[in-house]
A protein has these predicted regions:
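Conserved Rossmann-fold NAD(P)-dependent oxidoreductase catalytic core, especially the SDR/UDP-sugar
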Residues: 90, 112-159
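Substrate-positioning beta->alpha
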Residues: 162, 166, 192-197, 211-233, ...
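Catalytic helix-loop patch of NAD(P)-dependent Rossmann-fold dehydrogenases
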Residues: 141-186, 207-211
Length: 282
């Protein structure tokens, strides 16, 4: 039957599970994994938007990270049919929350639960990729404007950064766990919405910025993150942490000027909001 053939094919290729597969970074990782010939499983919620997951070769696996018992059943059911995954790329997480406690719940506790379940079921992959963030460090070199190094001590100043840091430290605390952590800076590219809103604002002749002090910005293109992830898989690296950026530093004004240039240099009114107001609002 076609099911048997499909199952045989799945067993004969290296398998990769991408959690958060319907998201910005996850959807591009799925595309590249397919292009490289992996058996690709998209880890999604039942409510996930599948707009960028249309390829017929994608296998879907619903994962309920909020309920440990359900998650265990879903993963053990997969193991029974197909065995464990060769690689897991964990993109699932929260970047925006109304309640700050949700960052801790989703980014730390649910990641911990996921990893604990994999260990319990003997489903530890060859490599567990964790997509973290530069935000784990916080503004530690804000006064000197010098580059962050691996030897710096993270001091996150947001609930988001703290939740990702706690998840990182948990992975690092497990002896012999084959993690690879990537900390992208500001990620841009197709399907991204935040920088798109900034471009939209400039096109409508308003350049809005926060604070009156110098702001240095760093960026990385989404497809460069994808290439880094698969290079790490190719090289079979383990228990390493990497920053991902394009190697350049931009002043906030220079960044908005770049967007203006791409939009044909529309005139703009520059508005600045004091940082204290943003902190009160958030």
């Amino acid at each position: 039957s076609s099911d048997v053939c499909s199952s045989d094919l799945i067993h004969n290729v290296e398998s990769v599970l991408v959690t958060g597969a319907s998201g910005f970074i996850g959807s591009f990782i799925v595309e590249e994994a397919l292009r490289r010939g992996f058996g690709v499983w998209a880890g999604i919620r039942s409510s996930s938007n599948r707009e960028y997951l249309q390829d017929k070769k994608i296998h879907f696996l619903e994962l309920d990270f909020a309920h440990p018992g359900e998650l265990c059943a879903q993963l053990s059911g997969h193991k029974e049919l197909y065995g464990k995954f060769d690689y897991i790329i964990h993109c699932a997480g929260a970047t925006k929350c109304v309640d700050k406690n949700d960052f801790e719940r989703v980014n730390y506790r649910q990641t911990k639960c996921f990893v604990d379940t994999l260990r319990e079921l003997d489903m530890i992959p060859r490599q567990f990729v964790f997509i973290s963030t530069l935000s784990v460090f916080g503004p530690i070199r804000e006064k000197t404007y010098t580059p962050i190094t691996e030897k710096d001590t993270p001091v996150p100043n947001t609930a988001y950064g703290l939740s990702k840091l706690k998840a990182e430290r948990y992975l690092q605390s497990i002896p012999d766990f084959p993690y690879v952590i990537y900390r992208p800076t500001g990620v841009y590219g197709p399907r991204e919405k935040d920088y798109f809103l900034m471009a939209k604002s400039i096109r409508r002749h308003t350049d809005f910025s926060v604070g009156f002090r110098r702001q240095d910005l760093t960026f990385v293109y989404v497809k460069d993150i994808v290439q880094a992830v698969f290079l790490g898989i190719e090289k079979q690296i383990s228990r390493r942490t990497y920053f991902l950026a394009d190697g350049k530093v931009y002043r906030s004004r220079a960044f908005s000027d770049l967007i203006r240039k791409e939009l044909g240099n529309p005139f703009v009114i520059r508005l600045r909001c004091p940082l204290i107001i943003l902190k009160v609002v958030s």
